[in-house]
């Protein structure tokens, strides 16, 4: 095994196998993610792109080229975040696989022109590393191809684009552009011994000499130019504080990385410290000075700043640094190093002086050089102009119409005689084609146009005549001054004299000509006379001037379409605005009428006029020269009111809503008259909803006038009209709960009106024309009461700790009629508060004196249409019933939350209540009606009916139980035949038998006759239980037998003789049927189950002595009947119906005697 593993080939193949498997897994994942990118949301796309980047570029870089196009296609995505994620992917690609630069660089250039500033900033950030990696990659290529050359061209284009962005409007883009240019300057310059060293640094020293794409010198020159631009930008007066701090930091980094630029940077910092931009605020100045101090401290630590240490120290002292702090920053150097640097400083200074002197000499030489006209260049320009003019003319001379027109145009201008020059230069045309003639004529005219510098060829001439340095031939003269020929000296003297004479002559002529011109000018001044318009014109009549004015304004107004087509509609609107605001009333009213003719399309013009009036009112713009006796705000108020009235009268409903809303929301100020008009508009049925909504929005959007608009809504919240009241209260809730606008004022108003109810009669403050109740009323009406507490009830769910307490106080002190009104209005606010409101639960638990009815009503509301009441509510109600309120009605709302034992214990008290309340109770218990159908009880209908029968009659009147059972049996949908069978089956098992059992049996038999056989069996079981011992049940037994005859006759024969005698005595009508049945039985032979002679005698009516040994006669007295022990626990219920008094039970008659010694009926032994 070791030998196998030791083989390198095997290890290599195994590694390749695992690598291939890893790549395949990664490829499958990336394919799935790329498929999801098509339909994913923007946020999901960003997550998927991050996963692709992590997988492809993090662990499987060989997949980068395969999925590159899929990712780059998202560069056109509409979402900004997705495009930024693509930029991050491209940046990482250029770090991991820089050879893919030609494939991605076009996308970078495209995204640099994106519409989103965020994307542009992200691209600029990425371009820093992309440019560095790309430059290193291109330098490493031995033979760069076309793709590499194209990539370098695009990189250069990107560099130029970012350089232009240093003047971008966006502050963040400028900051990122500065940081990018910082990197470019560092990359395109040489490092020296003092440069700050970093990992992966790149400088011009790394650019190979054989690189064909770019040269060191060119890159260095470009880097120097970019540094100059940064220095210039750093010194501008309009630079922002953010850009200034960023530029300062970048220049400091450049100086640290390339100390060769240290002098320029220190000089820039010195200028900045002396002259901070005037646009900065005090806090910005402090930030800039703090940043400058920090950058200077950083520079001072660098060895390359040794030459400028004194300058930096001076600036740091000025910026607040102490001498000790500065001394700690200076790097430590030995004496040799300091001497070497001092020597280098002197050498640099000497070189600088020599260079400066050399430049001064060159400049002086250039100034001393004489210039002359460059005739060769001038001739070359003339020839080029002639060719251009000749070509132009030849194209036009080919058209006969042009030639004819030209001849006819200039024919009258020909001289009478042929000029001599024409005769000298003219050559007759012999045997030339038309093309040759056109060429010849075009050349001739072209030369003339060039002489005059006319035609299209005039563009070839330079603006100034071409000049060149005058060439002076060097004449070597070895003659000394003594050897100069006298004739030559005399000749030179004569030439110089003639030259001076000519110059004097020209000067004299010029002075004479100037003197003549001055004389002419003075004579012209003498003849000139000032022209006065008033002396040569007459004033127009006033009416005519006004007519001209109105006609001119009307023409301006009617030129609307022409101005729109010409693109000057904004200038026309400005002109009309100024005219309307500054001209007399007749012009103003005319413009107003023009606007109102089509207010929907001309509303912008109206707003321009409105704002112009506002500017005049506030003194922001020119003042009108029209004299008026009105108040300063009259023009503005009049215009605004006319706009509002015009919109209301001339627009349809839809446009009226939109335009009125715009006017009120966009008007600079709203006078009281306009607010009053809005109040009147809100009283209109069609506009009331939109008007109140507008008032609410004005309260939110116009904080200075919020008190006024809230007061308007408060007035509407107590208006007589219900629709206005509801809308106003809803908007006040929004201001109160959502926007938190004047909550204290709203609380004060609501509580003030709530307390009006405590008074015996409505106060005068309730009645006003503003509230829709102009006439006072002596007594409270239900509507007036609801108006007073309506706002308080609306705000109750949002501040229950305040309003619930006040409502309780008012409820206690008010009259019974007003209490009923309050109870009927509690539903909506209590339901909004909910059963979990701690304030409500605390009120139920405390239940102050006099608040019982209110608390009961609250419990009813909280339990409406709820399957099962809240446990906390049930607990509070149970405690309330046990400790404070001993009225069982308090338990009614929470019946569905009680246990079975609690229901059984409280049932006797419930059925003794008012019939209406008892009906409601059984509707709840049985789930009758839509209101209670969803409730779930702990007892079934069967249990309820059985519980009613087992109620102790000493605790509850028998009549109440009878009524309760009747209510149950009336619900045939619930108490079906099967349910009643179950009830009777349970009742027959009860000991002693329930008093109303036989009554229920008879009612069940009446409802469902098919129960006859079941009842027969039931009667037999009753005989076994000696039914005759309970008189009421015995009577019911006999009535049941009567109903079931003749089928029930066998039941009578099972009775003991004494009870049979009693039955026949109480029900004589049974005797014939029984006799008939007995005779039918006599035909059968006697057997053990036959009819005895004693029974036959009883049936026939013969006298038979029947002995009864029990003195009770077989009946059990009421006091000896076994009773169920009552449950001591009681549960409370709430109702607004009064309780009926309990009925007094009827006395029980004495029992009838019976013989206990009689033999048992057949089958009982």
Swiss-Prot record:
Keyword Protease on entry: no
Domain of life: Eukaryota
Stretches the record annotates as Disordered: 365-384
Gene Ontology biological process terms, A to Z: co-transcriptional mRNA 3'-end processing, cleavage and polyadenylation pathway; mRNA 3'-end processing by stem-loop binding and cleavage
InterPro entries, A to Z: ARM-like, ARM-type_fold, Symplekin/Pta1, Symplekin/Pta1_N, Symplekin_C
Main location: nucleus
Positions of HEAT repeats: 23-58, 61-95, 98-140, 147-186, 218-257
GO molecular function list: RNA binding
GO cellular component: histone locus body; mRNA cleavage and polyadenylation specificity factor complex; nucleus; tricellular tight junction
Entries under SUPFAM superfamilies matching the protein: ARM repeat
Phenotype of the disrupted gene, per the record: RNAi-mediated knockdown results in overproliferation of testicular cystocytes undergoing transit amplification leading to increased incidence of spermatogonial tumors.
Signal peptide: none
UniProt xrefs under Pfam families: SYMPK_PTA1_N, Symplekin_C
Positions with biased composition (Basic and acidic residues): 367-384
Cell compartment(s), UniProt: Nucleus
Similarity comment text for this entry: Belongs to the Symplekin family.
Quaternary structure (record): Interacts with Cpsf73 and Cpsf100 forming a core cleavage factor required for both polyadenylated and histone mRNA processing. Interacts with Slbp and Lsm11.
Domain notes: The HEAT repeats have been determined based on 3D-structure analysis and are not detected by sequence-based prediction programs.
Cited function: Component of a protein complex required for cotranscriptional processing of 3'-ends of polyadenylated and histone pre-mRNA. Involved in germline stem cell transit amplification, differentiation and mitosis-to-meiosis transition.
Name recorded for this polypeptide: Symplekin
Record organism: Drosophila melanogaster
Organism lineage: Eukaryota, Metazoa, Ecdysozoa, Arthropoda, Hexapoda
Gene name of the record: Sym
């Amino acid at each position: 095994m070791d030998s196998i593993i030791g083989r390198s080939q095997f290890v290599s193949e195994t590694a390749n196998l695992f690598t291939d498997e890893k790549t395949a897994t990664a490829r499958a994942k990336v394919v799935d993610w790329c498929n999801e990118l098509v339909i994913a949301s923007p946020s999901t796309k960003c997550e998927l792109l991050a996963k692709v980047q992590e997988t492809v570029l993090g662990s499987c870089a060989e997949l980068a080229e395969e999925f590159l196009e899929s990712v780059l296609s998202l560069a056109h995505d509409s979402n900004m975040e997705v495009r930024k994620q693509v930029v991050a992917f491209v940046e990482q690609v250029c770090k991991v696989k820089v050879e893919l630069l030609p494939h991605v660089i076009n996308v970078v250039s495209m995204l640099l022109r994106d519409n989103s500033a965020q994307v542009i900033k992200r691209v600029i950030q990425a371009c820093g590393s992309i440019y560095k990696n790309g430059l290193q990659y291109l330098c490493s290529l031995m033979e760069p191809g076309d793709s590499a050359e194209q990539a370098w061209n695009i990189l250069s284009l990107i560099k130029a684009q970012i350089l232009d962005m240093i003047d971008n409007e966006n502050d963040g883009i400028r900051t990122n552009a500065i940081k990018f240019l910082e990197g470019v300057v560092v990359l395109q310059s040489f490092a020296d011994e003092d440069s700050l060293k970093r990992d992966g640094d790149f400088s011009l020293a790394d650019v190979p000499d054989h690189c064909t794409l770019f040269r060191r010198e060119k890159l260095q020159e470009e880097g120097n130019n970019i540094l100059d631009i940064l220095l210039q930008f750093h010194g501008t007066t309009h630079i922002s504080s953010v850009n200034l701090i960023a530029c300062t930091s970048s220049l400091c980094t450049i100086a640290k990385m390339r100390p060769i630029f240290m002098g320029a940077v220190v000089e820039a910092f010195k200028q900045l410290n002396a002259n901070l931009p005037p646009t900065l605020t005090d806090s910005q100045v402090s930030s800039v000075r703090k940043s400058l101090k920090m950058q200077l401290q950083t520079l001072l630590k660098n060895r390359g700043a040794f030459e400028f240490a004194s300058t930096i120290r001076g600036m740091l002292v000025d910026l607040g640094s102490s001498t000790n702090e500065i001394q700690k920053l200076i790097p430590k150097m030995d004496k040799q190093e300091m001497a070497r640097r001092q020597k280098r400083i002197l050498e640099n200074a000497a070189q600088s002086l020599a260079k400066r002197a050399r430049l001064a000499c060159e400049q002086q030489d250039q100034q001393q050089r004489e210039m002359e006209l460059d005739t060769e260049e001038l001739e070359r320009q003339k020839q080029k102009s002639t060719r251009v003019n000749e070509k132009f003319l030849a194209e036009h001379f080919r058209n006969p119409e042009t030639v004819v027109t030209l001849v006819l145009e200039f024919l009258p201008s020909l001289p009478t005689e042929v000029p001599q020059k024409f005769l000298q230069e003219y050559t007759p045309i012999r045997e030339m084609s038309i093309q040759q003639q056109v060429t010849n004529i075009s050349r001739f005219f072209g030369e003339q146009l060039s002489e005059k510098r006319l035609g299209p060829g005039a563009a070839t001439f330079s603006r100034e005549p071409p000049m060149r340095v005058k060439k002076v031939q060097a004449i070597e003269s070895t003659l000394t001054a003594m050897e100069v020929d006298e004739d030559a000296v005399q000749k030179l003297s004569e030439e110089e004299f003639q030259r001076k004479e000519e110059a004097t002559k020209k000067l004299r002529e010029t002075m004479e000509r100037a003197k003549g011109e001055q004389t002419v000018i003075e004579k012209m001044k003498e003849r000139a006379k000032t022209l006065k318009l008033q002396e040569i014109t007459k004033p127009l009549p006033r009416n005519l001037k006004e007519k001209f004015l109105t006609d001119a304004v009307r023409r301006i107004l009617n030129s609307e379409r022409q101005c729109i087509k010409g693109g000057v509609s904004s200038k026309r609107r400005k002109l009309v605005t100024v005219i309307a605001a500054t001209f007399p009333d007749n012009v103003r009213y005319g413009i107003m009428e023009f606007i109102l003719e089509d207010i929907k399309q001309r509303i912008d013009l109206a707003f321009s006029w409105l704002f112009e009036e506002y500017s005049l009112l506030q003194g922001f713009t020119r003042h009108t020269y029209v004299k008026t006796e009105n108040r300063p705000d009259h023009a503005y108020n009049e215009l605004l009111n006319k706009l509002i009235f015009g919109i209301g009268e001339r627009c349809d409903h839809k446009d009226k809503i939109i335009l009125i809303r715009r006017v009120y929301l966009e008007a600079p100020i709203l006078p009281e008259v306009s607010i009053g008009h809005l109040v009147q508009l809100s009283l209109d049925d069609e506009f009331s909803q939109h008007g109140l909504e507008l008032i609410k929005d004005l309260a939110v959007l116009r904080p200075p006038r919020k008190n006024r608009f809230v007061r308007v809504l408060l007035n509407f919240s107590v208006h007589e009209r219900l629709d206005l009241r509801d809308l106003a209260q809803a908007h006040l809730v929004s201001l109160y709960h959502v926007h938190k606008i004047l909550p204290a004022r709203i609380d004060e108003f609501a509580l003030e009106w709530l307390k009006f109810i405590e008074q015996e009669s409505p106060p005068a403050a309730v009645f006003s024309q503003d509230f829709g109740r102009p006439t006072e009323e002596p007594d409270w009406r239900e509507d007036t009461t609801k108006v007073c507490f309506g706002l308080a009830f609306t705000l109750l769910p949002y501040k229950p700790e305040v309003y619930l307490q006040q409502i309780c106080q008012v409820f206690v002190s008010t009259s019974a009629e007003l209490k009923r009104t309050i109870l009927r209005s509690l539903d909506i606010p209590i339901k909004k508060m909910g059963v979990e409101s701690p304030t409500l639960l605390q009120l139920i638990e405390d239940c102050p004196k006099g608040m019982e009815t209110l608390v009961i009503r609250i419990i009813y509301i909280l339990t409406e249409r709820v399957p099962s009441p809240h446990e906390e509510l049930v607990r509070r109600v149970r405690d309330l019933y046990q400790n404070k309120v001993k009225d069982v009605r308090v338990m009614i709302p929470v019946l569905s939350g009680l246990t079975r034992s609690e229901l059984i214990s409280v049932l006797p008290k419930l059925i003794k209540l008012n019939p209406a309340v008892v009906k409601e109770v059984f509707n709840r218990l049985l789930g009758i009606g839509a209101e209670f159908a969803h409730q779930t009880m702990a007892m079934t209908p069967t249990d309820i009916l059985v519980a009613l029968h087992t109620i102790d009659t000493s605790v509850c009147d028998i009549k109440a139980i009878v009524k309760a059972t009747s209510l149950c049996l009336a619900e045939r949908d619930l108490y079906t035949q099967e349910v009643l069978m179950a009830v009777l089956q349970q009742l027959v098992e009860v000991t002693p038998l329930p008093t109303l059992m036989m009554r229920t049996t008879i009612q069940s038999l009446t409802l469902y006759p098919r129960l006859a056989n079941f009842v027969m069996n039931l009667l037999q079981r009753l005989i076994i239980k000696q039914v005759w011992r309970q008189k009421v049940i015995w009577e019911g037994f006999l009535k049941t037998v009567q109903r079931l005859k003749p089928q029930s006759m066998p039941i009578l024969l099972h009775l003991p003789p004494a009870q049979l005698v009693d039955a026949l005595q109480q029900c004589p009508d049974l005797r014939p049927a029984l006799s008939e049945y007995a005779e039918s039985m006599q035909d059968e032979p006697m057997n053990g189950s036959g009819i005895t002679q004693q029974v036959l005698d009883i049936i026939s009516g013969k006298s038979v002595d029947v002995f009864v040994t029990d003195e009770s006669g077989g009946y059990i007295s009421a006091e000896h009947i076994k009773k169920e022990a009552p449950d001591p626990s009681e549960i409370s219920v709430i109702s607004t119906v009064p309780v009926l008094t309990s009925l007094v039970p009827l006395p029980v008659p004495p029992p009838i005697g019976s013989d206990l010694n009689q033999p048992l009926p057949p089958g009982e032994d």
